Amino acid sequence: MAKAPNNAAAARVRKKVKKNVAEGIAHVHASFNNTIITITDRQGNALSWATSGGAGFKGSRKSTPFAAQVAAEAAGKVAIECGIKNLEVRIKGPGPGRESAVRALNNLGIKITQIQDVTPVPHNGCRPPKRRRI
């Protein structure tokens, strides 16, 4: 006896719906080891994202400004396809990719309306890692 076609498999392959959003928020998380760029709409729903590691950089090259620039360009191109024209940029972290990610988004033709630093600053919370001696 033949099996009936599985509807669950057909549901998994459905076409992705493109959102048409004019303005959004770019969250740039710049750590010492990697840079993560997520572009969301105003409600916080992710439209696109990219990382330095996902852009093809491995090891210590992930933590370079150029890797952050390439990742920001990748996330920005997908966001432009979703209709993004204006962006607020929220930067978190002390990493080397902070400025270059913002410049890359600006060079794509996206208008940046606001740049905000949302790096969490402790009110003397956890003890930081010990200083490196080389």
UniProtKB/Swiss-Prot annotation:
Functional note: Located on the platform of the 30S subunit, it bridges several disparate RNA helices of the 16S rRNA. Forms part of the Shine-Dalgarno cleft in the 70S ribosome.
Q: Does the keyword 4Fe-4S apply?
A: no
Q: Which domain of life is it from?
A: Bacteria
* PANTHER family in UniProt: 40S RIBOSOMAL PROTEIN S14/30S RIBOSOMAL PROTEIN S11
Instruction: List the InterPro entries hit by this protein, alphabetically.
Output: Ribosomal_uS11 (IPR001971), Ribosomal_uS11_bac-type (IPR019981), Ribosomal_uS11_CS (IPR018102), Ribosomal_uS11_sf (IPR036967)
Q: Which SUPFAM superfamilies match?
A: Translational machinery components (SSF53137)
User: Keywords on this record?
Assistant: Ribonucleoprotein, Ribosomal protein, RNA-binding, rRNA-binding
Q: What is this protein called?
A: Small ribosomal subunit protein uS11
Native species: Janthinobacterium sp. (strain Marseille)
> Per the UniProt entry, what is one GO biological process?
translation
User: What's one Pfam family here?
Assistant: Ribosomal_S11
Q: Which family does it belong to?
A: Belongs to the universal ribosomal protein uS11 family.
What high-level taxonomic lineage is stated for the organism?
Bacteria, Pseudomonadati, Pseudomonadota, Betaproteobacteria, Burkholderiales
